């Protein structure tokens, strides 16, 4: 049975919807998200909108919920109903991808509520056992400030407190031989996010074939995520294509099939990129049936959304380098002092619903 079939006919009653804004300053980066709260039948379901543009959150929170959300449905009926509701009626979106991010938030809240109303939880209804969750910490080695240089110090500061921590790093154009050698010496790098699909964003990286060649050679066991495949880089990537994986362009099964060197050995199944849960669960089934590995990824969630992606990773792909570290690892102040959980993260699911207990 398809995974989605297990939840499609869950009864769902929504009596009201409300929003809660969350905000956190992470160094030079201010992150806003919105918690979606559905209430019905004495229960509450939650999800988190991880749209990146602050103006989209402010508009939504000021305007309140759109019409058409309340009533009695099956979960699948509600999902289809969402497809006909303008979730950005208050304005926006600033970016097209935010449509899927917000759809994911509303569906997550609805699924959490439907499962609670049914007296069950997601792992139970899918027949999947939550397992200890392997995670990596994702970071760049340079601040977002103009002229900031990459440094190994942020990584070493974290390793000093959490010596078994593994990393997914964002290589930047200023990575020189000295820095690369120092990173290799740590033995702590699992993945390199080459950001080949980002254009016009603060995380853009200029494609540098010479840097690609160094990274491929010096990190022979690291995953190479989202390379920019050009006439200059493809000959470098062809011999190591089994190490190539994809994140930013993956929103559906069709996207997985369309990537170079398909099928990939593994792929980043980032829940919020898929939007409707039906598409996400179809991708999980597709990868499992074809022996394609999967790992999870987050969007700097500040609330329940982080736990929900950890929940999914723990039941679908717990043993892979999941980029879903506890939120404290995103905060330099917390990540450099004791107290955060280490990998693997023990399952901590709520007896009801779709929620991971922090």
Sequence positions of predicted segments:
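Structured beta-strand/loop patches that form or line metal/cofactor-binding pockets in enzymes
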Residues: 1-57, 61
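Broad gene-expression machinery/nucleic-acid interaction feature
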Residues: 33-35, 132-134, 266
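Metal- or metallocofactor-binding catalytic centers and their adjacent structured scaffolds
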Residues: 39-118
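Active-site-facing alpha/beta catalytic cores
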Residues: 97-230
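Residues at alpha-helix termini
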Residues: 116-117, 289, 315
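Short glycine/serine/threonine/alanine-rich loop segments
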Residues: 120, 292, 318
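Catalytic core of soluble alpha/beta enzymes
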Residues: 175-311, 322, 326, 330-339
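C-terminal extensions of enzymes
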Residues: 330-358
């Amino acid at each position: 049975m398809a995974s989605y079939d297990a939840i499609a006919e869950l009864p769902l009653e929504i009596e009201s919807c409300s929003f809660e804004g969350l905000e956190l300053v992470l160094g030079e980066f201010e992150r806003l998200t919105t918690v979606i709260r559905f209430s019905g039948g004495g229960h509450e379901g939650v999800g988190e909108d991880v749209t990146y543009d602050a103006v989209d959150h402010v508009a939504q929170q000021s305007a309140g919920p759109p019409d058409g959300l309340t009533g009695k449905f099956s979960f699948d009926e509600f999902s289809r109903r969402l497809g006909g509701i303008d979730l950005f009626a208050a304005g926006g979106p600033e970016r097209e991808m935010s449509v899927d991010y917000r759809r994911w938030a509303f569906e997550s809240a609805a699924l959490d509520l439907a499962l609670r109303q049914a007296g069950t939880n997601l792992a139970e209804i899918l027949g999947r056992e939550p397992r200890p969750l392997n995670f990596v910490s994702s970071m760049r080695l340079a601040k977002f400030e103009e002229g900031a240089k990459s440094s190994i110090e942020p990584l070493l500061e974290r390793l000093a407190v959490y010596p078994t921590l593994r990393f997914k790093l964002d290589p930047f154009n200023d990575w020189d031989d000295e820095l690369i050698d120092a990173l290799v010496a740590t033995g702590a790098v699992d993945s390199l996010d080459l950001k080949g699909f980002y254009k016009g964003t603060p995380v853009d990286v200029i494609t540098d074939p010479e840097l690609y060649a160094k990274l491929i050679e010096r990190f022979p066991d690291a995953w190479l995520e989202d390379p920019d495949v050009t006439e200059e880089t493809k000959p470098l990537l062809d011999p190591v294509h089994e190490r190539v994986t994809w994140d930013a362009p993956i929103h559906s099964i069709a996207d997985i099939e369309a990537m170079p060197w398909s099928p990939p050995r593994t792929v980043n199944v980032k829940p919020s990129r898929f939007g409707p849960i039906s598409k996400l669960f179809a991708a999980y089934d597709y990868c499992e049936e074809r022996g394609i590995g999967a790992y999870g990824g987050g969007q700097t969630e500040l609330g329940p959304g982080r736990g929900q992606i950890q929940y999914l990773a723990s039941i679908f792909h717990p043993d892979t380098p999941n980029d879903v570290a506890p939120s404290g690892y995103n905060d330099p102040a917390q990540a450099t002092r004791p107290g955060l959980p280490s990998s693997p993260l023990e399952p901590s699911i709520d007896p009801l619903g779709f929620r991971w207990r922090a």
